[in-house]
Amino acid sequence: MAGAKEIRNKIGSVKSTQKITKAMEMVAASKMRRSQESMEASRPYADTMRKVIGHLALGNLEYRHPYLEEREAKRVGYIVISSDRGLCGGLNINLFKKVMTEMKTWSEDGVEIDLAVIGSKATAFFNSYGGNVVAQNSGLGDHPSLEELIGTVGVMLKKYDEGQLDRLYVVNNKFINTMVQEPAIEQLLPLPKSEDEAMQRTHAWDYIYEPEPKPLLDALLVRYVESQVYQGVVENLACEHVARMIAMKAATDNAGDIIDELQLVYNKARQAAITQELSEIVSGASAV
């Protein structure tokens, strides 16, 4: 059994670690609340854009924008959104597993894949994995802006415009609640049609464009893609802070359990040492 002094040192070390994890838990909780507010503030815009675009995809336009046209998938692109920092449980690895499974399915069908990665964890993972990373972005911090994402999104849109991509997806963690965050893959291009049954009927919905649809659609559809990627970044950030808070709480609780176990071992060691000393005193007295 280890000596009492050694056990005391271990207890002190674990207590120091526990203070760090507790502080990180509190910081993550504070950041989580702020990121949730940002996420909730941006959701109405992103949801409305998605709804409008879903209607456009069902519309009957004389001008058919390339983003509305279905074509055979020979090469697909993924915009993968991860965190910049670790210590957030299995948040990133679960996301990577999901996208890797889908990429494997495409590869088995002979479809090539391009990747744009946002977040240093995704950059490190796919550079190590060997994926064809054509754009990367990291260091967005806790207050990402749309302007910081335009370059990365623009690379993928340019490839789509030039016919080098036939599908474009965004991959990120979806914030369900503080206990549930799920990895999700959503199609950006070609534009997904509205799932509203009322809109599926012929001529159920159409817009009137003045003076003409082309310049409006050219700007609107690019803005739609950018808004969905931005919403993905904001949601992923909220998921990151929640996951880190939960991971640090678990670490703090585990440290408490270890301290209790070490304290028990320490008490036993101290008791054994006292018993040994008493035995030696009694033996000495008997000898005299």
From Swiss-Prot:
CDD domains with a match to the protein in the record: F1-ATPase_gamma
Keywords in alphabetical order: ATP synthesis, Cell inner membrane, Cell membrane, CF(1), Hydrogen ion transport, Ion transport, Membrane, Transport
Protein localization: Cell inner membrane
The UniProt record lists the keyword Transport: yes
Any one GO molecular-function label of the UniProt entry: proton-transporting ATP synthase activity, rotational mechanism
Membrane-crossing residue ranges in chain numbering: none
InterPro entries (alphabetical): ATP_synth_F1_ATPase_gsu (IPR035968), ATP_synth_F1_gsu (IPR000131), ATP_synth_F1_gsu_CS (IPR023632)
UniProt KW NAD keyword: no
Membrane topology (UniProt): Peripheral membrane protein
Gene Ontology CC annotations of this record: plasma membrane; proton-transporting ATP synthase complex
Main location: membrane
UniProt superkingdom: Bacteria
GO biological process, one term: proton motive force-driven plasma membrane ATP synthesis
Family matches, as PANTHER family: ATP SYNTHASE GAMMA CHAIN, ATP SYNTHASE SUBUNIT GAMMA, MITOCHONDRIAL
HAMAP family in the cross-refs: ATP_synth_gamma_bact
Subunit structure: F-type ATPases have 2 components, CF(1) - the catalytic core - and CF(0) - the membrane proton channel. CF(1) has five subunits: alpha(3), beta(3), gamma(1), delta(1), epsilon(1). CF(0) has three main subunits: a, b and c.
Family classification: Belongs to the ATPase gamma chain family.
Cited NCBIfam families: ATPsyn_F1gamma, PRK05621.1-1
Function: Produces ATP from ADP in the presence of a proton gradient across the membrane. The gamma chain is believed to be important in regulating ATPase activity and the flow of protons through the CF(0) complex.
Protein's UniProt name: ATP synthase gamma chain
The organism of origin for this protein: Aliivibrio fischeri (strain ATCC 700601 / ES114)
Taxon lineage: Bacteria, Pseudomonadati, Pseudomonadota, Gammaproteobacteria, Vibrionales
